[in-house]
Amino acid sequence: MGRSTKKGPYVDPKLLKKIRQLNEAGEKKIIKTWSRASMIVPEMVGHTIAVYNGLKHIPVYITENMVGHRLGEFSFTRRFGGHADKSASKGQVKK
């Protein structure tokens, strides 16, 4: 079940405060955040936010298409090593 519409989207208050300060000053700095659950709002468009993935901060440039999604969706926490080669399994003999 999703969040109630009367509450509005969750955005970390400190992150939103930093975004608003940068918008007033007209600056474009990278903002570090650990708040992966924060919703991307239109005020964030054009900023680069470094989202923590458990190991390091991944820079994410916010575009209009991302509005309504969560910051954590763009900073993967797991590394995909790839599927096994089919050629490696062909040489095995079934018993």
From Swiss-Prot:
One Pfam family per UniProt: Ribosomal_S19
Superkingdom of the source species: Bacteria
Any one Gene Ontology BP term: ribosomal small subunit assembly
Keywords recorded for this protein, A-Z: Ribonucleoprotein, Ribosomal protein, RNA-binding, rRNA-binding
Stored Gene3D superfamilies: 30s Ribosomal Protein S19, Chain A
GO molecular function, one term: structural constituent of ribosome
GO cellular component: cytoplasm; small ribosomal subunit
InterPro entries found in the cross-reference section: Ribosomal_uS19, Ribosomal_uS19_bac-type, Ribosomal_uS19_SF
Functional note: Protein S19 forms a complex with S13 that binds strongly to the 16S ribosomal RNA.
Recorded family membership: Belongs to the universal ribosomal protein uS19 family.
Name this protein carries in UniProt: Small ribosomal subunit protein uS19
Organism (species): Thermosipho africanus (strain TCF52B)
